């Protein structure tokens, strides 16, 4: 009798426990993905503000960025969930401030090692210094592949995180770097797995110097993602997260979730994605947004996120994953401002605000930055000349900017002598003008400012072109690769060269009235033209420049700009008036 009672008690307990255990096993596992993009080696606070909502419908400018603050923000978000992973969507390095670029972005990689970055997709800028230097970023070492000496402070250990390049194939058909990764969270029957796919935009080959990517093939983004997502699911992934260096252009605030009015090249990729994708972390456009793509296409209810640039924002993505049915049951995301330190700009003081979280500097990361800054600061702070006002990169209706004209004039001055190439005109691409050049109150500009404006380290190239070839290059502003009438890439001309364009005319007939110092450009006449080495290789889809002959090498772009501004003296002349390009068709 007692034995029967004992068995009954055990059975009752088992019956009572079983549902509880089943519920525990079925309860979703929450995974957090902490994401950012387009960091561009912004180790120090970039003197950047994000406009954010304030009470009563007002707005406040919040100072953001700086890797020591970013590290602290990541740590705080991680503390909220041990099941966390940190990712980026490309352009982690290059086009960087001098404190990182002077050292080939080694300090940026080291800072990310300290932060605990897990995965980083390649972006177009990861290829700026060529494939071998990118591999050195991953694998470490001190072998020299550029004009700068690596390992100037310490031997470089390489990235402890994995760089992903799913759509970049080498000559043998293999990916240059791994294309995917998998992270496991939880144990036993509560274990879930999240797969990651990392890739860059297919047009990367048009955005970097061709010689640095010789032999590489950049494949279709959607095809690559879909194939990788299927493989990850077959390997047991319960969720698939895409890290892609391509993006969107939002109309609303940094943390708006509506997708209202959103545009951009990434939309063409999203419309073709496999429905097994759960999250798309994007970049490239330097915007911030969170879009529930299910509002656009109910059959593809994935999140699409982006976090501005320079470590200004972190996207905190939460996934609830069912460990029994092996799928995501809920997802959400928020963009978190990385509030850093106050500064003043032309609009006034940008102060810290209690309306948004503040983050202290991470001491280990701050010490790393200080060590490199001690070496770089004298170079950055060196005054090189004066300007009468700011040279802004913002273009007028014809696509011409003061900054672009200033750089083109510097290129011409550096190469116009008979012993320096005999150039009579020069062009620079508007995409190479990285930032505005804003002098101090007394007009002084520093080498660090010039480097921020021209950070790519391109050499000048002088070549002989016919007037017809020059015309063909200008036509490619509107019709070559990704360059279109809707999204042109404008060449910035040097003084003395003028022309007009009429977008109502058919392709190949839009450029009119080219003149040099008032005289018409003859299609069959020859001219010595200066461009940067990126354009000379056909960069930005300006393949017409490859037709040039009698090439002569020149100084680096930033050195030409330094010499030109230094020669202006204590009383510099007025800045270029942006009257070299005439738009003949209405906007």
Where are these regions (language model features)?
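Positively charged n-region of N-terminal signal peptides that target proteins for export
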Residues: 1-5
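Bacterial N-terminal signal peptides
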Residues: 6-14
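Short, flexible active-site loop motifs that bind/organize anionic cofactors or intermediates
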Residues: 12, 215, 460
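C-terminal segment of classical bacterial N-terminal signal peptides
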Residues: 14-21
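Acidic, metal/ion-coordinating pockets
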Residues: 21-342, 403-413, 426, 464, ...
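Non-catalytic terminal accessory segments
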Residues: 23-36, 58-67, 75-81, 233, ...
């Amino acid at each position: 009798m007692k034995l029967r009672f004992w068995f009954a008690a055990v059975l009752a307990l088992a019956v009572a426990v079983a549902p509880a255990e089943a519920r525990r096993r079925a309860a979703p596992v929450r995974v957090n993905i902490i994401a950012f993009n387009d960091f561009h080696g912004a180790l120090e606070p970039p003197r950047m503000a994000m406009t954010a909502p304030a009470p009563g419908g007002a707005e406040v400018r919040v100072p953001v960025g700086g890797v020591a603050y970013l590290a602290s923000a990541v740590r705080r978000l991680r503390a909220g969930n041990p099941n966390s992973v940190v990712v980026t969507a490309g352009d982690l390095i290059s086009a960087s401030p001098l404190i990182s670029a002077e050292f080939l972005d080694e300090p940026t990689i080291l800072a990310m090692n300290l932060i605990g970055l897990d995965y980083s997709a390649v972006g177009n800028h990861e290829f700026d210094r060529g494939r071998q230097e990118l591999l050195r970023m991953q694998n470490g070492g001190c072998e020299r592949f550029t004009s700068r000496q690596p390992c100037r402070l310490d031997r470089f250990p390489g990235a402890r995180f994995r760089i992903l390049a799913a759509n970049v194939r080498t000559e043998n058909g293999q990916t240059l770097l791994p294309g995917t990764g998998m992270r496991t969270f939880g144990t036993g029957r509560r274990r879930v797995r999240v797969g990651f796919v990392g890739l860059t935009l297919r047009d990367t080959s048009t955005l970097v110097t061709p010689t640095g990517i010789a032999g590489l093939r950049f494949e279709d983004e959607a095809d690559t993602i879909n194939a990788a997502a299927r493989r990850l699911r077959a390997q047991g992934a319960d969720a698939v997260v895409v890290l892609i260096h391509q993006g969107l252009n939002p109309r609303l605030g940094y943390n708006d979730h509506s997708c209202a009015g959103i545009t951009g090249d990434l939309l063409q990729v999203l419309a073709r994605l496999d429905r097994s994708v759960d999250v798309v972390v994007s970049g490239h456009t330097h915007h911030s947004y969170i879009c529930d793509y299910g509002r656009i296409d109910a059959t593809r209810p994935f999140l699409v996120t982006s976090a501005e640039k320079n470590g200004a924002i972190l996207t905190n993505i939460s996934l609830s994953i069912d460990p029994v049915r092996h799928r995501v049951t809920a997802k959400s995301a928020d963009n978190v401002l990385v509030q850093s330190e106050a500064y003043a700009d032309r609009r006034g003081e940008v102060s810290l605000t209690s309306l948004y979280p503040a983050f202290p500097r991470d001491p280990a990361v701050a010490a790393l930055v200080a060590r490199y800054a001690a070496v770089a600061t004298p170079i950055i702070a060196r005054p090189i000349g004066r300007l009468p006002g700011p040279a802004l990169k913002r273009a007028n209706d014809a696509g011409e900017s003061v900054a672009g004209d200033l750089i083109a004039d510097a290129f011409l001055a550096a190469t116009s002598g008979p012993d320096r190439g005999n150039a009579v005109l020069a062009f620079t691409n508007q995409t190479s003008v990285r930032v505005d050049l804003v002098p101090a109150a007394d007009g002084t500009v520093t080498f660090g400012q010039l480097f921020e404006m021209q950070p790519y380290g391109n050499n000048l190239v002088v070549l002989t072109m016919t007037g017809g070839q020059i015309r063909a290059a200008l036509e490619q502003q509107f019709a070559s690769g990704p360059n279109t009438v809707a999204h042109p890439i404008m060449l910035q001309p040097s003084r003395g060269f003028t022309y007009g364009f009429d977008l109502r005319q058919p392709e190949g007939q839009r450029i009119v009235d080219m003149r040099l110092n008032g005289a018409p450009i003859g299609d069959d006449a020859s001219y010595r033209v200066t461009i940067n080495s990126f354009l000379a290789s056909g960069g930005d889809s300006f393949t017409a420049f490859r037709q040039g002959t009698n090439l002569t090498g020149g100084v680096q772009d930033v050195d030409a700009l330094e010499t030109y501004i230094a020669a202006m003296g204590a009383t510099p002349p007025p800045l270029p008036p942006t009257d070299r390009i005439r738009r003949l068709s209405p906007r």
